Amino acid sequence: KTYVKKIYKNEKIQFGDRNYTWCYGDLVMMQTFYNAALIIQNESYKKICLEFFEAINIKYRKLLSPTLCHGNSGVLLQLLHFRKIHRPRNVNLAFFNVIKDYKESYIYKFRDCEKYDGRRYYLDKNNLLTGSLGIYYAIDLYFGLEDHVGLLNLIM
């Protein structure tokens, strides 16, 4: 089955437990599919994507990390980007799920959480994808700061 047929068949949405992370997640895949639908001017595909965006129900406890790549700030970044298409109702919830991981005692105020062999490791990082830089970038955009270099368009 194709990706779209797995989530949409017989005119019924088949959304299940989705992976909403930025890297290899369903939101980015559907954004790509939506952009393709716009290019080929396929209203049926566009409708599928918009219904997917409306059905987003993110279970944040599954996301261990606040980071952009595989954590809560990546979800926030995607939802902020989707504002161009529609008004996602989960933007504020996504923001609060990033902020809950803020700790004054951490070097960069946020820590990446990696899981290996059933154990969790918390790491102080300051890079874009798995560190505090990406988290602060998403928070800045949430508060309306301008993306002067167009990074959002590059990574989305």
What are these regions (language model features)?
Residues K1-I56:
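Long, well-ordered mid-to-C-terminal structural blocks that present hydrophobic/aromatic surfaces
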Residues Y8-D26, I56-N72, G118-G131:
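Solvent-exposed loop and edge beta-strand segments that line ligand/cofactor-binding
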Residues T32-N35, I39-E43, E51, A55, ...:
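Terminal, non-catalytic domain-edge segments
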